[in-house]
Amino acid sequence: MKDYISSPLSPSNKKMPDNQKISPTNTPIRKKLFENTQSPIHFISNNNNNNITTPAKGLASVIKFNSSNYGNHHHQHHHQHHNNNNNSTVSGSAIKQHLNKSTFSTSGTTLTSSSDAILLPEDKVPMSVYLRIRPLSKKEIESKESNCFTVLNTTSVSIKSSRSDSDSNKFSFSSVLPPNTTQPQLFKTITHPLIQSFLTGHNVLLLAYGVTNAGKTYTVSGSKRNPGIIPRSLDLIFKSIPNNCLKKTENLTLSNNNNNSTNNNSKDSKDILADSSDDEYTKVDNIDSSDEDDSNAKINSNLLESFSTTNTTATTNAAAAASSTTATSNGDVIQISDQFNYSIWISYYEIYKKNIYDLLDDSPSSKKKQSLKIESDNSVVNIKGLKEILVSSVEDARDIVEQGESNRKVGGTKLNATSSRSHAVLTIKLFTSPRHIPKSDIHPSQIRCSKLCIIDLAGSERASRTETTGETFKEGSSINTSLFTLGKCIEGLKQQALQQQQQQQQHSSKRQSIHHSNPIPWRESDLTRICQEYFCGNGKASMIVNVSPSSCDSEETLNVLRFSASAKEITTLSKIKPMVFLPPPPTTPSISLKKRKSMEQPINNNNNNNNNNNNNAYYNITQLQNSVNEIKKKIHLDNLLAVGQLPISNNNNNNNGKFDYISMEKDQLLDQIQIYQKKLSNYEIKFVESEVTLREEFNNELIKNYIELENQYKERLVKESQLIHDRVQSKLSLIKNVNINQTNKLNCKIEKLELQLEQQQQKTMEANNKALVIVPQTNKRTDDEWIIEITEVQTERDNIQNKLNSILFELDEQRQHNQFSLERIQQFTLQTEQLEIERENLLTEIESMQSKGQELIKLRELEMMQLKESMNSDAQKDRENLEIQHNFETSNLNNQLQMERQEKLQIIEEMRMLKLELQQFKSNQSIEQQRNNNLIKNQYYNHNHPTAATAMTTTTPPIMSTPPIMSTPIKISSVGKFKATPSKSLIKNILGAHSNSPFKNANIESSVGGGFKVQLNIPGSPIQLAPGTPNSIQSQTPDRPILDPNQYSDSGLLMQEIDDDDYLNITGGGSANDGNWTDINVNDDSASEYDDLNSSSKSFTKKPKKTKSFGTIKRIKAVAMIPANIASSALNSSTTNIDEKEKLEKLEKLEKEKERLEKERLEKEKEKERLEKEREKEKERLEKERERLEKEKEKERERLEKEREKEKESKPKVVKKTTSSSSIISKKPSSKTTSSLTNNNNNNNNNNNNNNNNNNNNNNNNNNKSISPIKTVQSPNSPSPTKLQPHSSPNTNAKEYFNLMNPQVIIHFREPETNFVPSVTANTTTSTSTSTSKSSKKTLDSLKDTPKKIANIFSSKSSKEKEASTSSKSSSKISSSTSTTSTAPKLKRFAAITASHSIENGSESSPIEVDTPPRITKKPPVPIVSKVSSKKVSSSSSSTSSSSSSAATIKRVRKIVNEKKNYLEDDDDDVITKMATETPRKTLGLRPRNLISQPIQFR
């Protein structure tokens, strides 16, 4: 049955606006028919919902508009209008078909119909376009390619092109699939709805489009792990089709070789039915859409026959089967009806270089494959010779697809190693036929064919980027050409849609215009010819646009997106071919076949008459009414027959009066059936009547519309004919004008020829006249001759006319040639314009590439800057971490140092105690032995003023019965950084060593600072001392300093290795080099002696000693200048009672400790470098502190001076004449003198204390504590002094000498003031008695600060060359301020304390004169101490220069040092003195005076 042609399409191929479409709900009787319904009837359904439950839905669906378009040329309009009118009739059989397929509910109030059994309305489906963005590849990530896409939402994106940085490039799609979309998600979003439409009967086209290397093949085919669209589609199709309904045969192949086929679907159905060996299919004739009218006639007759039956059950089942064909998705599987048989056919081919090749061709590879040709008719494409294989399982289908993919053309380019070089087309056909109809009754119209076409398009590419040449370049050019043609076709469809919209607007505004759209170039490419069926015919089209997110592909991607934007705006028409159901014949025939034919014959005749009548466009209402009457009669007869066949129950007699309940129930059921049949018949009659009235009104309106359209068309034809007439007239006028011009020219030529002819005739006449005159006139010409001549002239004229015609013809040809050349010129100009556009595009691309290069350079620079900054920040962080780690390590090291220092202090204390015990024992033995030896001597004191006592020599008074005494300094042990001061027991042993010692009962008191105060009372003596001689001696030991670990030199933990001499000194065995004294020249002030001193100290420090020790035990040598036999005997006897084994064990432990500390030394040396920088800062702070302390000391000093002056004033003045200094000096050292050994270590201590960052002003003095030398002053109340003869024996001891003194002597061991550098001033004694008071006053003044000026008795060598160099530099600065200072000789201690007592008979005591020579000193290394010392030196030098005797005294002392070498030397270093360089030794010369009976105070 042919569909009706509706009015939305005008003869000029214009579409009517929506408000002019005819719908049953727009008629005047709408309210009358549908006032009880909830929703109006929609004439055209815009969706796929086919379950509309409205009473007139089935009726509306029968009236269906055809979408066939009119021709594009005006000369086809009339003919097509004629054909449309022929088809504008409604067949009465269609009504009966609809009535036959309608079902009613049992309640009689609700009507339902199945629209699938009827022709479905056409659906205008917009083309779905999906965008899939592939992720960046590894190479793109390594090359740092950026993503040019920005996903705005699920349906729109924006792209940033390399040419333009603007974000205006925004595109919208049906759906946007981001890079993280999986294959199942893509299939569910895109392909699943398409498969559902395919199973319901729609034709579906799916395109995969994009540039090369964008992921098209992966999307379509996928991989083994992630299959693509094709494998998943096959799985879904075979899962959805019931197994019992699937055609199962061996693989059956079809070859399309029918050249005369006009419909692919009909041919396929014929081939299927012909080639099938199953009983389900039968052979049928060829079916074509043009033959549908004939087939519909046959079907209508069958419908009328079936309509007469009363078997409503069969019709209900058929309708239910039809309704079940609608596929419903239940999860992944689509449920379809099992009332049909299904068969699936697959074909796979490719389009390579404008040729089609079958991918399923099994021909040998050696043979060249033959290309296939396309044949098309009525917009249906057929490929001749293409294989189509019947498949019955998923495995078979997959094998076929894999075979085709293996035969596909694949090549490698720069951008893609496996680039597809052809368009692959996979076609899946699904044939559907009803199962309940026997094979003999199957009609081809009952077979439905739906197609699923999946096309994997080859990627568009640029040869400049892919770098293809040769055959690959040709492949790329053919791919680009076919894609360009597809783009033009889609753009043409878009323009047609826009024009149709404009025409609709013009119709609504009642404006008329003629638009001639350009034809769409479908035939320019095989790809577009294949796709034409789906775009322009019946089908749904979808497109998957695959794009690359790389910024380098942004230009090609932008073109693809523009193409997809055009494709999104087009729409396709999709309709489902209805399934015609033929129910089985009725079981109870009510009307004979002849009567049904006679009933049907008027209707068919009416249809034929309407088809032959070209001017009738409306229904024949009378025929419809007749058909209604026929239906009423039929229904009435059926009801009568049904009633007559009802069984009547007469079982009462047979059952003996019992009720036959079964028969009664049957009667009730029959009554209900009759009631329902009446209702049904009434309802059908009403429905038909309403349908007839509806059709009548609809046809009236339709006729009006057709009349209007016909009038409009006639007007247009008139206008067009007028235009054509005008054009013909204009052409004719042009031809006439040309002919007139040509005839005018010819007339001009003829006139000229006639003139020439006349002239010639005149000449001939003249010549004849002359001849007549001369010659007798001949015979005249006859008429025939004249006629002949005229005819000749006419022939010439005709020849000329022919020439003119030929010239005109040539002119026409020339015009045509010129017109053709103009067209060629226009073409060439277009080509040149295109080339110019391409050149401009290339230039813009070059500029964009240059800009990209600059941007890349800038990006690289920025990256380098960022990298540098990050590296700098990392380096800074590493430095900070290293500093933190370093600080942490140093803190740990400091903690270790503190712990080690504590251990060292314990060891030092043990060594100190051992040394003290050794010294006590040794000193007691040596002193006692010396005393016993001195008792033997008979020579005593011999006071002789001109002779001076040399250092460490004994003086013997001339008259003395007591044993002699030698004046030796009291020994002090130095352990580590501490000086061990004598204990009480030691002092008592020293003072009371002799049995006759007068000092046994000495008073010993402890001072506050830790020292001792000893007061010796000299008993009365028969010897009368000179007036002014002191009768008491008082001195004080240095206080014990407090431990300060920062005073250690060399980071506080270094100690020298103990050598053999040190070991002997510790054990008390002495040294082998004790008697080897070095001669020095005191008068030489050059630096050579100092260099010798430094070299000796260096040689000492350069010994192979491991300098990791808690402190070096210094052996202190204070040996008096006594004979060798006495000294050796004393030293040998001192080691007899000492346990050497215990000491050796302790020394072994010390050796092990040294080895452990050696490893730590290197680490601490590194730490020392860092601490040196901090020391410099600490020095500045110490300078300010020292200045403050100096001021305080000066104030304290002034206060003490005032107190001393008061004391001196309170004492009586002593007037004693003394001899001049010249008389005191003698060449032979016969007189006994007292000298003191001063050892100044303040400079070294100050230097090391500054380096150790400690404020060691007080500690320096504590470390430099020494026993103040004994000084003798003359008592003011003593009588006139008498000269004492000096000792003549060199073996007398100073201890015994003091024991022989009768007067009371008080000795104070006092702590020196801090930071005071002692300086010794030379004092001279007066020779006259009148100047005794002045001399004594000067002596007291010079001796006021003697404890501060005298250096420590014990000193050590410098252990470092660096300290010696710093002291030498500092000494050069102080040399300018004092003239008496000079480089120190190579000595460590020098003390000369001699006291000569001249005891006269009858006198108390003889006076003692003290002469102190100037000191020899060095500048200390610390600048602050140097300033202090320089002040003291300058004061001392000024005092020295005041007397003339000081120079003589200095010479005398130097001579004594050179001759006698009476000085003490220590070969070992002291840890305390390591902090400073070796300081000069001070010498003090004492001139004896007559002792007096009164006590003498020494401070």
From Swiss-Prot:
All residue ranges annotated as the Kinesin motor domain in the record: 126-570
Compositionally biased residues, Basic residues: 72-82
GO biological process: assembly of actomyosin apparatus involved in cytokinesis; microtubule-based movement; mitotic cytokinesis; nuclear division; protein localization to cleavage furrow; protein transport; response to mechanical stimulus
Extent of Basic and acidic residues compositional bias: 1161-1212, 1338-1348
Alphabetized InterPro entries for the sequence: Kinesin-like_fam (IPR027640), Kinesin_motor_CS (IPR019821), Kinesin_motor_dom (IPR001752), Kinesin_motor_dom_sf (IPR036961), P-loop_NTPase (IPR027417)
Keywords for the protein's UniProt record, in alphabetical order: ATP-binding, Cell cycle, Cell division, Coiled coil, Cytoplasm, Cytoskeleton, Microtubule, Mitosis, Motor protein, Nucleotide-binding, Nucleus, Protein transport, Transport
Spans annotated as Disordered: 1-27, 68-92, 252-273, 497-521, 1021-1049, 1088-1107, 1161-1295, 1318-1383, 1395-1451
Residue ranges with Low complexity bias: 252-266, 497-506, 1217-1265, 1324-1334, 1365-1383, 1425-1446
Biased composition, class Polar residues, residue ranges: 1029-1038, 1266-1294, 1395-1406
Residues in coiled coil: 739-923, 1134-1257
A family per Pfam: Kinesin
Gene Ontology molecular function, alphabetical: ATP binding; ATP hydrolysis activity; microtubule binding; microtubule motor activity
Subcellular location: Cytoplasm, Cytoskeleton; Nucleus; Cytoplasm, Cytoskeleton, Spindle; Cytoplasm, Cytoskeleton, Microtubule organizing center, Centrosome
Entry GO terms, CC: centrosome; cytoplasm; kinesin complex; microtubule; nucleus; spindle
Function: Microtubule-associated force-producing protein that plays a role in organelle transport. Its motor activity is directed toward the microtubule's plus end. Required for cytokinesis. May be involved in a vesicle-mediated transport of myosin II, the Aurora kinase (aurK) and other proteins along mitotic extracellular microtubules toward the center of the cell and the cleavage furrow in order to ensure cell division coupled to mitosis.
Family named by the database record: Belongs to the TRAFAC class myosin-kinesin ATPase superfamily. Kinesin family.
Protein name: Kinesin-related protein 12
